[in-house]
């Protein structure tokens, strides 16, 4: 019998499954059933472009420690496969030591005996109506893979999301700056500082060695656009309709969407020059949309919200 707080879909789709709505750090790893695939993701607040770079602390940040909970479960249960998803900034984090966080993750997976594939996938490159980039990480316990062909055609991610032939594959060892995680954490890519991460948009790691390259999606199927998935104007609720006055208001939509170079003052009184480029406004209907973020909808002006024009605006 269902209680008022129960979700009937949980019972109809998996009545005998185990659902634990609890902080994972409080769960004893031994109590987790044996499984073949661990699938998950990290909070994106530490890496996402929704925040400015100085606040993107990566795995050294408070929320980033979720990775070590995943690591704890892997260490105890040793599932054969691992599938993770995150924002693509993970490959570049943190700002002052590009690629360190991902290097620490790869090195810790190597210590547990996993071979790893990763790919940054832009949904729009495979026909979806949104330009949304995410990095997918697939790992296999004692995985046997050919590095070059795994990236280009034979890997799990390459088979699911084909790419064009690779131009160049770079390789390096994770242990160049030391063998343990502490050395990698403190020394990896330090000489490059905030200039460049060594990790390309695709790659593999096996036995502590990394092969990586820039990957371009190879897709010739149907391609959707923002205009093709919109509701018809007559079905849009009034709360989402903007009037011309709101659009033209000083420091409103046009200001927020536009490019700017201006002096600003922080809460501590420090003044600095702020600049950013323009965002297409209204959003173009003939191509995939910009990345959709939390906080869409409503009439309050925002640089990140999507605005489309159904008919000429008066005024």
Regions found by a protein language model. Name each.
Residues 45-49, 90-93, 127-131, 145-147, ...:
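Short catalytic/ligand-binding loop motif for oxyanion handling, primarily in non-cytosolic enzymes
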Residues 105, 117, 131-135, 288:
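Residues that flank catalytic or metal-binding motifs in active/ligand-binding sites
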